[in-house]
Amino acid sequence: MFLAKNLKNNKIKVCLPKKKFAALSTASIQTNERPNPDKVLKDIAKYVHETPLKSSLALDTARLCFLDTLGCGLAALKFKQAQNIIKPIVPGTIVPSGTKILGTSYVMDPVKGAFAIGTLIRWLDYNDCWLAAEWGHPSDNLGGILAVADHLSRLNKATHGKNGKQFLVKDVLEAMIKAHEIQGIIALENSFNKVGLDHVVLVKVATAGVVSKMLGLSQEQTIEALSQAFVDGQSLRTYRHAPNTGSRKSWAAGDAVSRAVNLAYLVKNANVGTIPSVLTARTWGFYDVLFKGKPFSFQQRSKYDSYVMENVLFKISFPAEFHAQTAVEAAVKAYRILAKQGKTFKDIKSIRIRTQEAAMRIIDKSGPLYNYADRDHCIQYMIAVPLITGNLTATDYSDEVARNPEIDNLRSKMYCIEDTHLTQNYHDPDKRSIGNALLIELNDGTQLDEIFVEYPVGHKFRREEGIPLLMNKFQRHLREHFVESPDKVDLIMKVSSKTNFLNMQIDKYMDLFTEG
């Protein structure tokens, strides 16, 4: 409808449109009724606060995971960049009753301490692994768990029990089991990588959940912290993939656990509030914004218990991205076979790598490799080095080693193909295999028998074989760090093996790992 004014007689003419207007929509009017918290938040919080842990296998595995993770953290200190990333922003800062950082003399607040510990234990990509629809390293959560447990224990002593809480090694292990479970169960069917998100979002969520209880928060406050973790800006996987692979992948988990600890403290100290439909809110929620409108699926396992810790994968033999572990093992076998025939890598014409879809997406890489992080996420590089030397170590990713032109020459002779059967077994919850096979053709036209390795030493199916090797790995990392203190190495090994180890105060145990 519009109006036209007759200027002569000052009359107003009403003009109606020929077509009727459509009924006005009120769909844009948003209701402000506060919903109940999303079920995912409630389920996690209930698990953290109410579910008792009864699995002796999970507890035994958690002890191995704990020791292995600490050893990996010490080993990271051999690298200058790792040292520089974790040091205090203000030099010389010592926080009263703060978190002690393993392998150093640093004493930090629990937020910065979580970043430092989380960064060290992830730096070498040598700690445990969980492979499902989403990949990840659940022991990353120890960065936040240990930082909070150590600080609260020291605070408890300093205030004669008035503040803080005394944590035992067993408390830390149980927190690890629950953090592993939260991260791993969500990862079973929900692929964050396929929407471009990094798996450390799950580290942030899992750490926020278990740390909330450690801080004495209620179940409702834990929901509050979890909602804040989900709404927090999530990391992109850009830094894990060509052509942008870089060192951030080595400190992303440290960043995630520090943010989780900070959020839990914000809930504790400032009651920052719950975002109840953080996942399900239309338009603005996590699902619509970041997950293409798809809610999380929990068809394989709908309950949280201790499944993930019981089935976690250990990296024992090589500091290699887990999808390449069996490929590296196959390469070492190939090196020995060639040696028996009086041949070397120089006799190789081509190498076919039969692998799983996940490896194709993550570590199949050609062209120049620019840094350590680039190399330890290239399956061709991780195969080439042991074919040349017979082994693969953390230093083999260094610039010095990478200058060897034979490595890139050998890389150029390799190609990957996906075996859908291997991909199927990779996702099979009863197998969880990570198979790789190498078919090597020599310059004289002969072929070696294909070398196939389906399960790495750290897999549950090879756990008994792996346990003594895992303890040797832990002891090796101790010896390499405490070179001038062999007695300290012996003491740590002795204490860590005692039957009453679980009842040791966590701060007393961590004192054994610090300097000064």
UniProtKB/Swiss-Prot annotation:
Signal peptide start-end: none
Coiled-coil ranges per UniProt: none
Name of a matching Pfam family: MmgE_PrpD_C
The protein's Enzyme Commission number: 4.2.1.79
InterPro entries given in the database record: 2Me_IsoCit_deHydtase_PrpD, MmgE/PrpD_sf, MmgE/PrpD_sf_1, MmgE/PrpD_sf_2, MmgE_PrpD, MmgE_PrpD_C, MmgE_PrpD_N
Pathway: Organic acid metabolism; propanoate degradation
Source species, domain of life: Eukaryota
Entry similarity comment: Belongs to the PrpD family.
Entry protein name: Probable 2-methylcitrate dehydratase
Gene source species: Saccharomyces cerevisiae (strain ATCC 204508 / S288c)
